[in-house]
Structure formats: C-alpha cells, structure tokens
Amino acid sequence: MSYTFAPRFNDGRSTAREDFHEPLPVCLHTHPRHTDPEYDARMHKGAHDNLWVITAISNPVRYKTRYSLYRKFKHHITQELKLNLITVECSFGKRDHQLTADLDDDNAKLHVLKNGVKTIDIRVKNTSQVWLKENLWNIGLRAIPLDCEYVLFADADVHFTHPHFATELINSLQEYRVVQPFETACDLGPNGQVIGVHRSFGYCHANGWEWRPKPNNEGGYHVEKSKDRQGPSGFGIPFHPGFAMAFRREVLDKMQLLEVGVLGAGDHHMCTALIGRVKLSMPGKIHANYKKECLRWEKRAAEIVNGSFGYVVGTILHDFHGAKKNRKYVSRWEIILENEFDPETDVYKNCYGVLELEMDKKPKLRDAIMTYFKARHEDSIEVE
C-alpha cells in the first residue's frame, strides 16, 4: 500500500530546503496526525526497533529525588512509550551504584522486558565532582546496536505527553538531522502545578525567530526581542536549550556531544553552535581553550548538520527537583572564570572514559564545584 502526503509548505515543497531562511508560520511546521492504522503500526515498529533513548545518572550529593524521578522516567520510556533505554550510572568514589547494583563495575548488562523493550545498564565510576551529563551520554552511545537509526538523549526527569511521541520524533528526523523533541516545556512544582513554560530552541529556530542575546558577561542567557518586538506565536519563554535532544545515527557516527561544560551549559553551547552562534553562549573572558573546544564543535556541526535543526510537536513535563534559583545558571560562570578553568589541563578521562578533575592542581576550583552541587538543594520542595 502506498501513501501520498500533501505538501506542507505554501510553495508546493514537501520538504524543507536547507538554505531556507525566511520565517514560516507556526502552522506550517505542525506535523499532521496520520490516522491510518497501518501507517501508525509501521512507524511505531520502526521506533521500537530503531530508536534508542539514552539517559544518565550522576549523584555525588545523594539527592533522593534523582533516583525517584529516574524510576518514574524509566517506567515512562519503557512501559508507556515502549522504547529501548540505555542508562549510564556514575557512582562517586567507592559508593555502590544505586540503580544497577547487580552489575560488575566495568560491565554493561542487557535486559529484555516482557513487552520486548530492551534496556542496557552501564556502570562507571569517578572520584571528582564535575557536570557529567554529556560525557555520560557519549559513553552510552557505545552501547547502541548497529541497527539503531535514531538516538534520543533525555534528562531523567521529563515526561513526553504527545500520544504518538515516537512516531512524531521519527517523522521529524526525516526532515531535520537534529531536533529538540518538544515544542513547549512545562516546569512542574512539587505538587504537579505548572510554574513555568518554555519554547524549545529548535522550535524558535525552525520558525525563523532570531536568537539575539544581549552583550554581557553572563553566558548569553538573556535574549532581546526582535525589531517588531514580537516573539514566537503562542506563549512561553523562548529558546530553551535543555531537557532532551535527538539525532540521526549518521550524525553521531561523525560527531559526539560537547563535553566541555563541567558546570553545565553544554546544551546551551550545542544549540547555539547548531545555528552558528556559539561565541555568544559563553562569557567573553572565558579561557581560550574553553572557547576553542566550543568553536571546534560548532565547525564540525556546520559540516555535518548544516543548520538542519528543528523540533517535534508536543509538550514535555519537567518534574520538580528544587527551586531553579539554586541552579545559578548565570552566577555559576563565576566559578569557571575566577579559577580560569582550562579543559585541556584541568580535567582528564579515567579508564571508564569519565571526566575527572585534576583536584590537586586547583583546589579552589574543586571546592567551589562541590559547594555548587550541594547548594542546588534538589530535595527541597520550596518553589522560590
């Protein structure tokens, strides 16, 4: 049986040109919902077989919410969405792994659930506290099977609400090489109430909205409005870079995720690099080698992704784990700047491939990072 799909663009095109620059109306970027059961079944089978989700757990402060939210996330991915899942858990020092306790330290184990979904648990260790998410996601890539065609990296505290999420994700990855798998994101409070709404970076970019951060020394987190003072249609704070990102496998075969952000901001760097503006995602006084790593990733992305960066329709829910003011998204840059963090000499990779801090070289940097992680107060239920 063959299917004919109506063009989704007003000039008769059925796909987006990679050199397309003028903004498109939001409605033209909305993927249609197909109701043919054979189509849905075929796309769902493709998602089940060819799409893998990778997440990571690193919890040196031993926050309880990290584990409870992960278990909720795992149930959502494997039981509700019925997608394959790779979890990379990094334990600190000689502590036991909390989620993959049945494995040897240097081993990975494949589990096949009753519904046919596969999960892979990977155990690694480190002895210093740095931001590891992108680093652990890259380690998870080593475990994906050869027939995997699409990879979704996701924080272990989100919930995808679209009823046909996997189908829509794969459809979007036919059009774009990289996507943020949501249009809007809702931050939830401790009682499940919505306390904030965001629009994804991919959504804003795909709809022609220009990211224009104010010149400052705070990492490019403040965005100016355009000349007409209008933002993307709808509501929500624009250009959110976080929560999740999905790639075609062919992209990840040529480039992996950027690991330079030892206090976070890796997602921010990568989203801005995908649109060729990574210089504006970091303070101007950042160490030259930090800037060099980001620019190198941007150059590689320009060659491989070539601006093909979009989004998936739908909303994700972001579970509460402490007030966002404690993340200090802007002021944490002071730790990096004051200690002149150099990614070429201040960190190394251990035998597991996990980033370690050269702790004795810069003890002030070591102590400041430890203080930062403790000050996040992720088990607190205070919203403000």
What are these regions (language model features)?
Residues H159-R277, K292, W297:
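Conserved catalytic core of nucleotide-sugar-dependent glycosyltransferases
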Residues S2-D49, N59-L69, F73, G261-E384:
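C-terminal catalytic/acceptor-binding lobe
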Residues E89-C148:
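Active-site-proximal specificity loops/subdomain of glycosyltransferases
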Residues H48-W52, H75-V88, V117-K118, E149:
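Short loop->beta transition adjacent to catalytic acidic/histidine clusters or analogous donor-positioning motifs
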Residues V88, V179-T184, V312, D319:
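Short glycine/serine/threonine-enriched helix-capping/active-site loop
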Residues I57-R62, L69-L81, V88-A108, V158:
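A conserved acidic beta->alpha catalytic loop
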Residues H97-A101, F165-A166, P190-I195, G322-K324, ...:
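Short aromatic-enriched loop/helix-cap "lid" or pocket-rim segments at secondary-structure transitions
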Residues C148-T161:
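Short beta-strand-to-loop acidic/aromatic patch adjacent to the donor-nucleotide binding site
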